[in-house]
């Protein structure tokens, strides 16, 4: 289990498991452009995502890996959102302060889904708003990190296990 999951003592509720399984089926049927996502094989509360840097952005060509850590009672509570790969936009392995994250449970809506969370994260990544967990860098610094992102990710065992088709050498 992830060290970031504060609900280790609480197994996920039946509703939580049902909802997360349904959301994964939906994402599998209707993938999100520039985002890959999969639950951990050993923990339904821990999802792993990859954001593929969009063309004509400082992130172009980058591969950004991170985690969504759901609470045992999701969708009643929002997940933690973490970024593992240095992007020049977010601190690594720090909870991100977004209205769709556990930083702001008061603004969370149970109608939001994993897809909407990931789309919100992608949108926020392209923005320059400063918040807890974000950092300020130049576009040139972001471009340099984009070129180094895959080498960084290949050193991460979990990334390589969950996204082997990305981790393979070309």
From Swiss-Prot:
Sequence ranges assigned to domain UBC core in this UniProt record: 15-165
GO biological process: ERAD pathway; protein polyubiquitination
EC number: 2.3.2.23
Domain of life: Eukaryota
Active site per UniProt: 97 (glycyl thioester intermediate)
Entry keyword annotation includes ATP-binding: yes
Protein name: Ubiquitin-conjugating enzyme E2 J2-like
Lineage: Eukaryota, Amoebozoa, Evosea, Eumycetozoa, Dictyostelia
């Amino acid at each position: 289990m992830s060290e970031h999951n504060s609900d280790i003592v609480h197994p996920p509720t039946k509703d939580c498991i049902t909802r997360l399984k349904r959301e994964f089926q939906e994402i599998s049927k209707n993938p999100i452009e520039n985002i890959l996502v999969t639950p951990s094989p050993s923990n339904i509360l821990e999802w792993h995502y990859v954001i593929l840097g969009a063309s004509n952005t400082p992130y172009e060509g980058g591969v950004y890996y991170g985690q969504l850590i759901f609470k045992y009672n999701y969708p009643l509570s929002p997940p933690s959102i973490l970024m593992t790969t240095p992007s020049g936009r977010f601190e690594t392995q720090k909870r991100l302060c977004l209205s769709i994250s556990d930083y702001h449970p008061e603004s969370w809506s149970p109608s939001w889904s994993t897809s909407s969370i990931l789309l919100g994260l992608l949108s926020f990544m392209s923005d320059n708003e400063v918040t807890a967990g974000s950092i300020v860098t130049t576009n040139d610094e972001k471009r340099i990190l984009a070129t180094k992102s895959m080498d960084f990710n290949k050193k991460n065992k979990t990334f390589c296990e969950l996204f082997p088709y990305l981790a393979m050498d070309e």
